[in-house]
């Protein structure tokens, strides 16, 4: 055992460790050495470094305890990603060119583009492979054996190679942690897909994260269902109806506001420069009101509107070629009014 003081805690080096160090897109294990919390683990220059906030006496014996919930979650994510990547490679020849696991999702970068229908089939086939509950095989082939195998690898490998086989879906060089049987993954769900370089980036979840996501989506959908008085399976149609109604009502409001602008403009016809106060107008309505009145008042027009949050919207229009002193006068008038205490019935 060795304990080195660092800038933000201590680096603990053991003669043996069951903690997985960060690498290959997979975060490190966390846990405890005796009662000292291990925040993260990294490999550097052949050493496994355990990052802690407290020191441990050098040369003492320690008992490590891995955060199993975290480890098993990462095993589920990593194993699920292997099956997806293997099936994509087998069906379309695309490579996994980037992989990252975070605390909520994993991302997989593929070298080619797949349609939604193709991804749906990959997802379905992945879950079929999971439910077969096949044993995951981990081997350490010799160099001669390795040369005869067709396996996935992102880079040229030297030294001893560790192969992870998911029967019927993937054979890949990998140093990460994995489940012992595919059934332990539980399920895989592809959440989103976006264009990325020459291919696509998948965002997906596996295992318990799928259940957590399903519970969240179900709770959200149930609340929407109650608010819209719609059945659970019909909320999308209910939202579409609500959007149509909202669009229709917005059209009516816009028409009524145009009529209001016409009346307001007529009231100030030929009046010269005009300053108006209207409460609660949206920014676009402030602009439309100023533009309408300016067309009739033979001067420039400024509209000032107070919002419910204490902020204000202001817009003023001037005619092309209007003298600068007129504009200055309007700005002075605006300044004088904004310095006054405003009341709700202005």
Predicted features, each with a name:
Residues 66, 124-134, 297, 332-341:
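A common structural junction motif
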Residues 11-12, 45-54, 106-112, 314-315, ...:
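A generic structural motif
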Residues 70, 90-196:
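Functional cores that coordinate and move charged inorganic groups
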Residues 29-32, 79-89, 176, 284-295, ...:
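Short amphipathic alpha-helix segments
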Residues 191-346:
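Terminal appendage regions of diverse proteins
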Residues 3-18, 59-71, 157-171, 322-341:
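Short, hydrophobic/aliphatic alpha-helical segments
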Residues 1-60:
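Conserved nucleotide-binding/hydrolysis modules and their immediate coupling elements
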Residues 17-33, 57-108, 341-345:
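Active/ligand-binding-proximal structured segments within catalytic/core domains
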């Amino acid at each position: 055992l060795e304990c080195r003081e660092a800038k933000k805690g201590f680096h603990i080096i053991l003669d043996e460790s069951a903690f997985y160090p960060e690498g290959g897109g997979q975060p490190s294990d966390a846990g405890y050495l005796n009662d000292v919390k291990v925040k993260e683990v990294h490999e550097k220059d052949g050493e496994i470094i355990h990052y802690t906030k407290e020191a441990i006496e050098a040369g003492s014996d320690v008992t490590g305890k891995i955060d199993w919930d975290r480890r098993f979650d990462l095993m589920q994510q990593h194993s699920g990603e292997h099956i997806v990547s293997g099936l994509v490679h087998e069906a379309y020849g695309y490579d996994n060119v980037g992989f990252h696991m975070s605390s909520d999702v994993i991302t997989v970068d593929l070298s080619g583009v797949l349609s939604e229908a193709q991804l749906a089939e990959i997802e379905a086939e992945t879950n079929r492979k999971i439910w077969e509950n096949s044993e995951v095989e981990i081997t350490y082939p010799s160099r001669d054996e390795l040369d005869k195998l067709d396996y996935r690898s992102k880079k040229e490998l030297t030294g001893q190679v560790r192969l992870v086989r998911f029967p019927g879906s993937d054979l890949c060089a990998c140093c990460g942690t994995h489940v012992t049987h595919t059934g332990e993954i539980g399920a895989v769900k592809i959440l989103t897909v976006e264009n990325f370089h020459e291919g696509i980036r998948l965002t997906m979840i596996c295992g318990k994260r799928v259940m957590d996501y399903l519970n969240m989506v179900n709770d959200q959908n149930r609340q929407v269902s109650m608010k819209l008085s719609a059945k659970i399976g019909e909320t999308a149609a209910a939202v579409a109806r609500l959007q149509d109604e909202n669009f229709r009502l917005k059209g009516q409001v816009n028409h009524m506001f145009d009529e209001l602008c016409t009346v307001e403009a007529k009231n100030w016809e030929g009046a010269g420069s005009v300053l108006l106060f209207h409460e609660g107008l949206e920014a676009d309505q402030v602009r439309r009101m100023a533009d309408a009145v300016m067309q009739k008042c033979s001067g420039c027009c400024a509209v000032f509107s107070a919002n419910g949050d204490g902020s204000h919207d202001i817009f003023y229009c001037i005619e092309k070629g209007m003298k600068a002193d007129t504009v200055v006068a309007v700005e002075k008038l605006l300044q004088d009014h904004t310095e006054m205490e405003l009341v709700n019935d202005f």
